[in-house]
Amino acid sequence: MEIKIYQINRDRDKNFVKFLHYKHLDNFQETKDINASIYDEVFRGDADCEGLEDVYRMFNTEGHPLHRGHSLSVSDIVVTKDGAYYCDSAGFLKVDFDEAKTQKPEPYDGGLC
């Protein structure tokens, strides 16, 4: 399964939404829209997963050698061919997410691609 994982960069997180449940976003930033400009791409590549729950298990508990971020957690975004998904306290929510606004830390080798 081809995926990308994005995680919030604390230096750009002026509203303190890292690890925040989706339902509380508007309390901290006046909207539930995802601010892609505070996210860093931390993984891009093929993961041996069938679905989002497998992605969670791999990147939260098992790990992946090319993953550059912390374990997958609340507020992280997983992008698949079907769209972008917000990792929430119980599962994933499909969201609008503008990948063009994200940051790709240097040096960046693109994971498995």
Question: What do the PLM-derived regions correspond to, one by one?
Answer:
Residues 6, 103-106:
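Residue-level detector of intrinsically disordered/flexible regions characterized by low predicted structural confidence
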Residues 68-103:
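Short, compact, well-ordered microdomains
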Residues 106-113:
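Short acidic DE-rich linear segments
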Residues 27-79:
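Short, conserved turn/kink motifs that form compact alpha/beta structural patches or helix kinks used as
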Residues 1-47:
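Extended boundary segments
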Residues 14-17, 26, 41, 57, ...:
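Short non-domain terminal segments
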